[in-house]
């Protein structure tokens, strides 16, 4: 489909699905378990990948919403689950243009993430060990910190959607 701009070849970038939870989820949910195409250039970390996207016309990359929405050098795009479904933005509309950045930055569309209308939203879990071992106690303590009011504020400050 015509999206405007010059007619460029698409250069996809990704983290390795074997080492990235986001890339693994993308392969599982979007590609239905099929491997990434050979054209996909694997990057070792998100920051260099975002820099490469900013420097490469026609490139595309996916990453967690908190790592991309507030960036000044790249544009996040709305996505839909099917051709007849509405596109949902990972940011609060209207989109703030990069020319206004860094004085103004796009904000995360927390409602779309919380109510799962953003198609690639996923939940993250803390899994702890059972029992009374030091590891189990530490895991429960960590969970309790995250579920506390202060923990929920820290989760939100990191760009994620609090659970409470």
Summary of predicted features, one role per range:
Residues 1-164:
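Exported/periplasmic ABC-transporter solute-binding proteins
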């Amino acid at each position: 489909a015509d999206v405007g701009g010059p007619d460029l070849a698409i250069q996809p970038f990704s983290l390795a699905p074997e080492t990235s939870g986001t890339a693994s989820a993308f392969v599982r949910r979007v590609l239905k378990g099929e491997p990434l195409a050979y054209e996909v250039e694997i990057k070792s970390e998100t920051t260099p990948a975002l820099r490469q996207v900013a420097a490469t016309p026609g490139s595309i990359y996916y990453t967690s919403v908190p790592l991309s929405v507030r960036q000044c050098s790249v544009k996040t795009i709305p996505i839909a689950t099917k051709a007849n479904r509405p596109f949902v933005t990972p940011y609060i509309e209207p989109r703030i243009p990069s020319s206004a950045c860094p004085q103004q930055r796009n904000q995360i569309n927390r409602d779309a993430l919380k109510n799962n209308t953003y198609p690639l939203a996923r939940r993250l879990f803390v899994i702890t060990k059972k029992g009374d071992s030091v590891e189990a106690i530490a895991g429960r303590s960590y969970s309790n910190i995250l579920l506390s009011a202060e923990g929920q504020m820290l989760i939100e400050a990191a760009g994620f959607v609090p659970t409470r």
